[in-house]
A protein has these predicted regions:
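Residues within the helices of the helix-turn-helix
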Residues: 47, 73, 96, 112, ...
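Short hydrophobic/aromatic patch on the recognition helix
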Residues: 60, 109-110, 114
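…primarily DNA-binding HTH/wHTH and HhH modules…
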Residues: 112-129
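Core residues of bacterial helix-turn-helix
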Residues: 53, 64, 102-103, 114
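Residues within helix-turn-helix
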Residues: 47, 58, 94-97, 107-108
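Terminal helix-turn-helix DNA-binding modules in bacterial transcription factors
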Residues: 67-105, 127-129
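A short, Lys/Arg-enriched amphipathic alpha-helix from helix-turn-helix/homeodomain DNA-binding modules
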Residues: 15-53, 74-93
């Protein structure tokens, strides 16, 4: 009886800790893109965020996958695409300006990733929406 209560408490506590880390990761991602991080450091990496939450990159990546069903890299990539969509629809910036603002070294990399994920080039997406 005691062992089961202890086990359940450990499991429940771990689940909550993992959810808290996901929330922190989401906040850190937003803070990164809202700051000059992309201009200073380029595209964010899994290691960068793992360091911020004091976990190894491998453990952090495994935890993100278990909680979200996506790898940490996919999660970051989806946030990049979401931010690119917002900029395409909410500003008059060129695709190049958006790419550099998100931390891409070359605008073509954003265009390629955007097309792979959405099925549209950034310009096609902008004109259709």
């Amino acid at each position: 009886d005691y062992c089961m209560r202890f086990y359940e408490r450990q499991f429940t506590t771990r689940e909550q800790v993992n959810k808290d880390i996901i929330v922190r990761f989401e906040r850190l991602l937003d803070d990164y893109f809202d700051s000059d991080g992309p201009l200073r450091e380029g595209l964010p990496t899994v290691k960068y965020f793992a360091d911020k939450v004091f976990l190894s990159a491998n453990y952090f990546g495994d935890m993100i996958r278990k909680q979200t069903g996506q790898t940490a890299s996919e999660y970051i990539q989806n946030k990049l695409i979401e931010r690119a969509k917002e900029a395409l629809l909410g500003t008059d910036k060129t695709t190049s300006e958006i790419a550099y603002g998100l931390g891409f070294q070359y605008p073509q990399h954003l265009s390629r990733m955007f097309k792979r994920v959405t099925g549209y080039t950034p310009n096609e997406f902008r004109s259709q929406n």
